[in-house]
Curated annotation (Swiss-Prot):
The active site is at E88 (proton acceptor). The gene is tdk. It holds the Pfam family TK. This is Thymidine kinase. It comes from Shewanella oneidensis (strain ATCC 700550 / JCM 31522 / CIP 106686 / LMG 19005 / NCIMB 14063 / MR-1). NCBIfam families: PRK04296.1-5. PROSITE patterns: TK_CELLULAR_TYPE (PS00603).
């Protein structure tokens, strides 16, 4: 039976690396996968999933308005899919997460989603909210804070490296813009 997985973490925990490894494992066994990523995140080029350690893969992009059932079933008809892997899944809409449950429940294709749980203010992203509610399996990938504790929060940095407390929920960036921290340090930076 196929299941919907949500692999979540703060930044720099290896989400994209894990996704690429999972896709490779399927393909190594002669199975087809569909790697997808949000069109909003083009840090490594449009239609690319890339890891900080240097591995990458082409990916089909989706926007918040795309119908994932149509996209995935078209790919499945072309290349019998054994697995769908979604990077940057925090950018999925509620309806798209519901569509992924359809892919799992009705078409019987496993879907592995990888993304952030919360934004730089500690608030859930829409995609993460519904994946936490509806996924069959929740898996936390871990990274560490500068103090050595588990980092489960993210802070946004301005151009001078200072923590920002306000701003739009989505601002695409990497290590120059974000830092993963433990809740204790998040509290000091944001809440206190």
């Amino acid at each position: 039976m196929a299941q919907l997985y949500f692999y979540y973490s703060a930044m720099n925990a290896g989400k994209s690396t894990s996704l690429l490894q999972s896709s490779y494992n399927y393909r190594e066994r002669g199975m087809n996968t569909l790697v997808m990523t949000a069109s909003i995140d083009d840090r490594y080029g449009k239609g690319k999933v890339a890891s900080r350690i240097g591995i990458e893969s082409d990916a089909q992009v989706f926007s918040s308005h795309d119908n994932l059932i149509e996209m995935i079933t078209a790919a499945h008809q072309e290349n019998h899919l054994s697995c769908v892997l979604v990077d940057e899944c925090q950018f999925l809409s509620k309806e798209q997460v519901k569509q992924l449950t359809y892919i799992v429940d009705k078409i019987d294709i496993p879907v592995l989603c990888y993304g952030l749980r919360t934004d730089f203010q500690g608030e859930l992203f829409s995609g993460s909210h519904y994946l936490l509610a509806w996924a069959d399996k929740l898996v936390e990938l871990k990274t560490i804070c500068h103090c050595g504790r588990k980092a489960n929060m993210v802070v946004r940095l301005d151009g001078e490296g200072k923590v920002m407390r306000e701003g739009e929920q989505v601002a695409i960036g990497g290590n120059e813009s974000y830092e993963s921290v433990c809740r204790k340090h998040f509290r000091e930076f944001i809440w206190d």
